A protein has these predicted regions:
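Short glycine-rich or small-residue beta-strand-to-loop segments that form or flank ligand, phosphate
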Residues: 48-58, 81-87, 168-170, 284-288
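Short internal beta-strands
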Residues: 78-88, 314-320, 383-385
Length: 464
């Protein structure tokens, strides 16, 4: 992909206030002091402020961060609203919100007096306001020519548009749609309308998640997100974070414009959240944390590890706690999981399906091909070891494994299997001198030999 910013502001990490770095472990006192000092120097007096923060699918020590922000804004801000950037995820319960933000469930006033905490409600059209549209010519420029005849209405949660200052607070990780998450992505798609969500995700899917994930700099989707964010009438700031996956440890924090703070943290995330291996594996077992409540969100266990799976290999998503494919996107069970080329080759049949659903489908199916004569051929097999019934799993074109038969220790002892005990945030890749994942690796071991679960892995790239 091009190194250009597609006509948008790329961000300059040297302009952001920064603490920490790759390999650094910041103390709570260091983090609190940095946050309070950064906010003290910002123009926030008598302002209506909207804090846009992640939901529980992102590792982030929010009680620590928000505590410091609350102290920094006390007696200064006119009003403060905390908006959970759910995107199209389901709403967080009062119990979950309390645990996530560090207050007694149902009583944010006790910990954050004067603040209001709100879920972003993507299912309610009245919560949105239109900021205008991105025209066809500009869309073509932003997407590198992938979208040449499409105008997009840019809608965002009214709480952001009506604020004087909108401040993003959240981590940066490798991301399958945009390259690296964070920054303006918390606005779009975090609290945006469906139009830009669908288009941005489909642009990413056209490029493919394998190509996009962990790509540094401004990708076409990042350019689209930055363009939409520039239309927000509120002043925009961001406190971007680099967090140790699955822990509360902070490696770095940056404050400034969303573009500058994101650029600073994306560079550090690339050194922190991308692990390079010396060899490919025939099988990966992704053990999913309980914060992923359905396959829609747990799909991260696939695409964060797909690059290290040999051609014809398998990714097993192990999540006994998951009982649904998607809570908020039931239509995914109608179309199933397929590669990009499956949809493009039959576009007339799928063009009216929400493009965000199509994009998600490709994310969990990975690389593959399709033609009328041979049908679909996928690079790797995808198997669910979850609480979802076998008939449902197979109906969406995925393989099934009874989670009760999964012996994590046995898999870990198998030299042909890579076990990730906390899947979903760290991206795994092969070292450049080893090669990529498109036909450059060979299957380690022989099909069906020494399977920890007694199965024969569906090698050769079938339909799963």
């Amino acid at each position: 992909m091009s190194d250009q910013a597609y006509g948008t502001e790329p961000g300059d990490p040297t302009r952001a206030q920064l603490i920490g770095g790759s390999g650094v472990q910041l103390s709570q006192d260091e983090v609190s002091a940095f946050v309070e000092q950064a906010f003290a120097g910002a123009d926030l007096d008598e302002k209506r402020i909207c804090l846009v923060i992640p939901d529980r699918t992102r590792t982030c020590p929010l009680p620590l961060i928000l505590g410091a922000v609350h102290r920094a804004l006390a007696g200064r801000a006119k009003e403060v609203t905390v908006l959970i950037a759910l995107g199209t995820h389901q709403a967080m319960s009062e119990q979950a919100l309390g645990e996530h933000l560090g207050y007694p469930p149902g009583d944010p006033e006790k910990t954050y007096p004067g603040w209001e905490v709100r879920n972003h409600e993507s299912w309610l059209p009245e919560t949105f306001t239109s900021l205008g549209s991105i025209g066809r010519e500009r869309m073509a420029e932003l997407t590198g020519g992938l979208m040449t005849d499409l105008e997009v209405d840019v809608k965002i949660n009214r709480l952001v548009a009506d604020a004087d200052v909108a401040i993003v607070i959240g981590p940066v990780f490798p991301h399958e749609v945009v390259g690296f998450s964070g920054g303006n992505k918390y606005f779009f798609p975090g609290v945006s309308g469906p139009e830009l969500i669908d288009v941005s995700h489909w642009v990413g899917a056209l490029i493919t998640s394998a190509e996009m994930i962990g790509t540094r700099g401004v990708t076409p989707v990042r350019a689209l997100v930055n363009e939409a964010a520039s239309m927000i009438p509120a002043a925009r700031l961001a406190l971007c974070l680099v967090v140790e996956s699955g822990a509360s440890t902070l490696h770095a924090a940056a404050f400034g414009t969303p573009e500058d703070a994101w650029a600073a943290c994306a560079a550090i995330s690339a050194e922190t959240h991308v692990t390079y291996l010396d060899r490919s594996y025939r099988r990966v077992l992704s053990v999913m944390p309980t914060k992923y409540e359905d396959i829609w969100t747990a799909a991260k266990g696939f695409y964060k590890l797909e690059p290290i799976v040999a051609d014809g290999g398998e990714v097993i998503i192990y999540a006994p706690h998951i009982t649904e494919v998607s809570v908020m996107h039931p239509q995914i069970t109608d179309i199933g999981y397929h590669s990009r080329d499956y949809f493009l080759g039959q576009w007339d049949d799928f063009k009216d399906v929400p493009w965000g659903d199509l994009a998600h489908s490709t994310h969990l199916r990975g690389q593959g091909s399709w033609d009328p004569e041979h049908g679909e051929r996928n690079r790797v097999a995808v198997t669910l070891a979850t609480g979802i019934p076998e008939e449902v799993v197979r109906s969406v074109n995925l393989g099934y494994l009874d989670p009760a038969t999964v012996d994590i220790a046995a898999y870990a002892a198998d030299p042909d299997t890579f076990v990730e005990p906390h899947a979903g945030e760290v991206l795994y890749r092969l070292r450049p001198d080893v090669g990529g994942t498109e036909g450059s690796t060979e299957v380690a071991g022989s099909a069906g030999a020494g399977e920890p679960d007694g199965r024969e892995v569906p090698l050769g790239g079938g339909d799963g």
